[in-house]
């Protein structure tokens, strides 16, 4: 009898009145209804309202659909943070297609691979990057030969750029974006996906440790992340958000969709400099922005003439992408920024943990606060499970702040999988978890703290060294602007730490040999002897488009330097 009652309750059907697939596209529809005249996107002298943005997105969807672009199609966009990039996050999935945001800092061979691998049938490209698209297509055609089918090419004009590149693109047969929109219907009757598991976006990993892989995201995950971001961050209706984070990186951590939730205002930036960040904060009363630690480092070390301090109001900053040094968090706080430290991956739609602030931390010394806030924290509201597991047994490590293991996730904010890569999917989803490849400890308060990427751990004389912890010490040296520590071959210990350092401008003319010795001495006073860098290399550090230092390049450089000769420690 009990079983029958349970079945009667459970078997009530899903019908159109009580069920629709979750998709972030509905947030745009609502914003246009509730706040039709509120500013949605500002880019230089161009401003759009939510009503206008909704109409433009529907025009884009309609124009694509008229050219038989829809479910099963992929639309690539190669552009910086401009209105068209924002519109693509809605207009492309509105016609049922998948959005593929391409990193503008990649070279033509890599872009050619991504466009071919994703089978993008449309390429939307900012005028400044038309040559990149053109070179990529030429490489694709050379490889494919007579079987090559040229994608539809749409060039996005930008009033802040010189017209020559736009004119050249048009002379090559590209369709201008505004002309393309004009062919679409602003009342296009878009439909939500039939299944929320339907793909909404495709992005490629940055390749900081390996070749990029295609990460496929679904409507359900994008919807949940779009709601989780403002909930975790305490964002208010009408937030003013500065686009310092590239939208092409993991769909801007899903903030294009989050801003529609809030009917907020996007302030676009083509190029990010500390001076522009301060200027936009003052001009538009920016309340929030996201940035990698390298951008925070530039902000706190900006020349006085580039800053506007004290800040006219509190500005909230979300950082992720690499473990931020506590010294940088401390400096940001001193300047009036309130930093929320998060952690995540392209495979988890962006941030999926947050170092949630606790009231009892308020009374602690600022340095202690910064150290606590440098941890990666606890799972996002929309992420069902997070743990740190022993890589050999698969069991959770103790919450002792010492025992290291791998960070793993399980939930609706985990990707569908890697495109056309079954072997990688089998490995990354082993045991029913998504394996991050990041090594961390779990503290007694259950906050996690990353110690390293599994590939970045330095093994010296059989002992593990956390490159992150060595970097945190190096960052405290007064001459250091940026630092990254990798393994270098060592004749005695197999490997030893090698520090790659970018100097602050005041120290660039100093004797580098003396500075290297001083940095090593500084580290020796604060670290175990075998953790101290045995070599220091000065110069700019290679980075991804989001500011993450590319350690795989530095590891190659360190290897090419040859082994450290018979060091004692």
Curated annotation (Swiss-Prot):
Pfam families: AMP-binding, AMP-binding_C. It is an enzyme of class 6 (ligase). Transmembrane segments: none annotated. GO terms for molecular function: acetate-CoA ligase activity; medium-chain fatty acid-CoA ligase activity. It catalyses: acetate + ATP + CoA = acetyl-CoA + AMP + diphosphate; a medium-chain fatty acid + ATP + CoA = a medium-chain fatty acyl-CoA + AMP + diphosphate. A motif (Microbody targeting signal) lies at residues 567-569. InterPro entries: AMP-bd_C (IPR025110), AMP-bd_C_sf (IPR045851), AMP-dep_synth/lig_dom (IPR000873), ANL_N_sf (IPR042099). Disruption phenotype: No visible phenotype under normal growth conditions, but seedlings have a strong decrease in glutamine and are resistant to the toxic acetate analog monofluoroacetic acid. It comes from the Eukaryota. Keywords: Fatty acid metabolism, Ligase, Lipid metabolism, Peroxisome. SUPFAM superfamilies: Acetyl-CoA synthetase-like (SSF56801). One of its GO terms (biological process) is butyrate metabolic process. It is found in: Peroxisome. GO terms for cellular component: cytosol; peroxisome. Its EC number is 6.2.1.1, 6.2.1.2. The keyword Ribosomal protein does not apply. Expressed in roots, leaves, stems, flowers and developing seeds. PANTHER family: ACETATE_BUTYRATE--COA LIGASE AAE7, PEROXISOMAL (PTHR43859:SF7), ACYL-ACTIVATING ENZYME (PTHR43859). Belongs to the ATP-dependent AMP-binding enzyme family. Peroxisomal acetate/butyrate--CoA ligase that is probably involved in the activation of exogenous acetate for entry into the glyoxylate cycle. May play a role to prevent carbon loss from peroxisomes during lipid mobilization. In vitro, is active with both acetate and butyrate. This is Acetate/butyrate--CoA ligase AAE7, peroxisomal. The gene is AAE7.
């Amino acid at each position: 009898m009990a079983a029958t009652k349970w079945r009667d309750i459970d078997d009530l059907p899903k019908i159109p009145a009580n069920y629709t697939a979750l998709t972030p596209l509905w947030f745009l529809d609502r914003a246009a209804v509730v706040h039709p005249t509120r500013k949605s996107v500002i880019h230089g002298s161009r401003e759009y309202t939510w009503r206008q943005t909704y109409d433009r997105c529907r025009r884009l969807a309609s124009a694509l659909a008229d050219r038989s672009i829809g479910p099963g199609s992929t639309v690539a966009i190669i552009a910086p943070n401009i209105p068209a990039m924002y519109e693509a996050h809605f207009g492309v999935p509105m016609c049922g297609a998948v959005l593929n945001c391409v990193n503008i800092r990649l070279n033509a061979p890599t872009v050619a691979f991504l466009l071919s691998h994703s089978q993008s049938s449309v390429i939307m490209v900012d005028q400044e990057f038309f040559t990149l698209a053109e070179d990529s297509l030429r490489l694709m055609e050379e490889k494919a030969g007579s079987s090559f089918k040229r994608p539809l090419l749409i060039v996005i004009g930008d009033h802040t750029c010189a017209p020559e590149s736009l004119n050249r693109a048009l002379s090559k047969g590209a369709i201008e974006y505004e002309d393309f929109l004009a062919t679409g219907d602003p009342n296009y009757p878009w439909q939500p996906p039939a299944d929320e598991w339907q793909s909404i976006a495709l992005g490629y990993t940055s390749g900081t440790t390996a070749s990029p892989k295609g990460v496929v995201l679904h409507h359900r995950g994008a919807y949940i992340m779009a709601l989780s971001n403002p909930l975790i961050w305490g964002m208010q209706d009408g937030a003013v958000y500065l686009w310092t984070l590239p939208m092409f990186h993991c769909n801007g951590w899903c903030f294009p969709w989050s801003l529609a939730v809030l009917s907020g205002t996007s302030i676009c930036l083509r190029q990010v400099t500390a001076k522009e960040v301060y200027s936009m904060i003052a001009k538009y009363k920016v309340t929030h922005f996201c940035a990698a630690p390298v951008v925070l480092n530039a902000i706190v070390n900006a020349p006085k003439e580039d800053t506007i301090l004290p800040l006219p109001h509190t500005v909230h900053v979300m950082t992720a992408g690499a473990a931020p040094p506590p010294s940088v968090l401390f400096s940001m706080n001193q300047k009036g920024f309130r930093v929320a430290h998060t952690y995540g991956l392209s495979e988890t739609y962006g941030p999926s943990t947050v170092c949630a602030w606790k009231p009892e931390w308020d009374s602690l010394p600022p340095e202690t606060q910064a150290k606590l806030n440098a941890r990666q924290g606890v799972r996002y509201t929309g992420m069902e499970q997070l743990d740190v597991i022993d890589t050999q047994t698969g069991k959770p490590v103790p919450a002792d702040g010492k025992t290291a293991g791998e960070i793993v996730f399980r939930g609706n904010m985990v990707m569908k999988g890697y495109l056309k890569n079954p072997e990688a999917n089998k490995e990354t989803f082993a045991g029913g978890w998504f394996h991050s490849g990041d090594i961390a400890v779990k503290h007694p308060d259950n906050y996690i703290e990353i110690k390293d990427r599994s590939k970045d751990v330095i093994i010296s004389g059989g002992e593990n060294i956390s490159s992150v912890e060595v970097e945190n010490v190096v960052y405290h040296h007064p001459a250091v602007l940026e630092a990254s520590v990798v393994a270098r071959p060592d004749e005695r210990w197999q490997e030893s730490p090698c520090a790659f350092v970018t100097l602050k401008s005041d120290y660039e003319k100093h004797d580098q040999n003396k500075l290297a010795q001083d940095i090593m001495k500084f580290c020796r006073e604060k670290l175990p002897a075998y953790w101290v860098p045995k070599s220091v290399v000065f110069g700019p550090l290679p980075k991804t488009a989001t500011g993450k230092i590319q350690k795989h390049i530095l590891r190659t450089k360190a290897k090419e330097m040859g082994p450290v000769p018979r060091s004692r420690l």
